[in-house]
Regions:
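A beta-strand edge to alpha-helix "cap/lid" segment located at domain peripheries
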Residues: 26-60, 67-170
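Bacterial N-terminal signal peptides that target proteins for export
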Residues: 2-11
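Bacterial N-terminal signal peptides
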Residues: 10-21
Length: 170
């Protein structure tokens, strides 16, 4: 009798644990999908801002403590310093972005995003150089980007660290 009682409640306990584990896994998958979707939306609006030379829209994609680490240029810290960097960038050229796949890894309130993107630059008004050190200078540039994103208090994502490595032309 005790054996039957013990077996019955042990099986019930294991069933409850298993159900709870499945529930947590489903919740985790849902959260992962929601984060991925939000992050991809961030890049969509960020790229629209670049392609329309919208500095405010661009800055809206960045955490206030953004760090830009451009290859061949100085490290830029803070959204207002980044805004100053963008002035000559958008005054001198227009841009079109062809983005590749995003490799997104979310770790709590931080996300690491890797992607390969090609940027098409068209100089304006006889310009032939962007005056901001570290800005892209070639008409076509393919780069491997590495961004660190931070979840904001409202649950949205913004870029905390932005850097890239140029992909050599073969």
């Amino acid at each position: 009798m005790i054996n039957k009682f013990f077996f019955k409640y042990t099986a019930l306990f294991l069933l409850i644990i298993l159900s709870y584990t499945v529930f947590l896994k489903a919740e985790s998958i849902s959260s992962y999908n929601q984060d991925n979707s939000s992050i991809k939306k961030l890049y969509e609006t960020w790229h629209k801002a670049v392609e329309s030379s919208n500095i405010d829209g661009y800055i809206n994609s960045l955490d206030k403590n953004i760090t830009l680490i451009p290859p061949g240029g100085p490290i830029i810290s803070g959204a207002e310093n980044y805004r100053e960097f963008l002035g000559p960038v958008f005054e001198s050229a227009t841009y079109k972005i062809q983005d590749g796949e995003y490799d997104i890894e979310v770790i709590g309130d931080i996300a690491i995003v890797r992607s390969r993107q090609t940027v098409y630059l068209t100089f304006k008004d006889n310009a032939n150089k962007i005056q901001s050190d570290g800005a892209l200078q070639d008409n076509i540039t393919t780069s491997d980007y590495l961004d660190v994103l931070k979840r904001q208090e409202d649950g949205s994502w913004k870029c905390l660290v932005h850097t890239w490595q140029l992909v050599p032309i073969k």
